[in-house]
Amino acid sequence: MDIAELLAFSVKNKASDLHLSAGLPPMIRVDGDVRRINIPALEHKQVHALIYDIMSDKQRRDYEEFLETDFSFEIPGLARFRVNAFNQNRGAGAVFRTVPSEVLTLEDLGCPPVFRELIDQPQGLILVTGPTGSGKSTTLAAMVDHINKNEYGHILTIEDPIEFVHTAQKCLINQREVHRDTHGFSEALRSALREDPDYILVGELRDLETIRLALTAAETGHLVFGTLHTSSAAKTIDRIIDVFPAGEKPMVRSMLSESLRAVISQALLKKVGGGRTAAWEIMVGIPAIRNLIREDKVAQMYSSIQTGQQHGMMTLDQHLQDLVKRGLITRPQAKEYAKDKRLFE
């Protein structure tokens, strides 16, 4: 099998990822579980050749120099793929994350109405958080798609690498890839403020400078979307504040309290009957939440989210209960992700 055939097999079987690892057969991840493909183990030189077939000269140089590299590529008519190539103890390895060619809508994802209300805001910061593989990129792509179809503005994305490719509809869209179109997130964000955007998507808030620039952009009339690998709204606020030196923390709390529109923390769970569905914790930046951020009372946020349903807020446990009630997930699956596991016994 060549790489195109392996990827076609992966897509046909609705796999989220294809794994190539020297010394082992190719494997695919389907509904969260890794499964072997029934073909012989691949040698190092085979995996190396499969990876090199789809790399540009620059990507090959990066791989040789740094022993790992990230990039994306597309097989027309099939899908786009986000690739990480690396080395391991048996030789070459690579993971291909499938990025569907078609962007799912907010309706497709079952997003609650508050998602649309949030992205109708003229400015502020919306954070989508969760572990790797929790569907953050899919949720953000649906938000960008909604804006693209319903608003007249300039959407600027900064990604590493570009995953979903958006075709300009009502909006002007410019998508920039780190290491190809810009040297880094902070450089691209600094430049973005002079590129007349209405909406800015930052693939990942990786460091102090990127977070600082994202807060500044949100304060100065832009709607900014970003991601973090945190698992809850409270942990997200802590992570952002903790990045800054002690002397700057009060100022950052003030900036964040003014600009934060929402934190959406998500997990991806197995659905009854196959497939996966997202479970969300949603914290909206209402005055009570802003005060808690400003006064460094993050521990009290959970109870505010619990009682804030009239504002579109919900805890992860509340959403898990709803998903179980609707028969979309099992109680054991909900219990695995729940904060209060007694709810699902």
Each predicted region: which residue ranges?
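Short, flexible helix-loop junctions that flank or precede catalytic/ligand sites
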Residues: 1-345
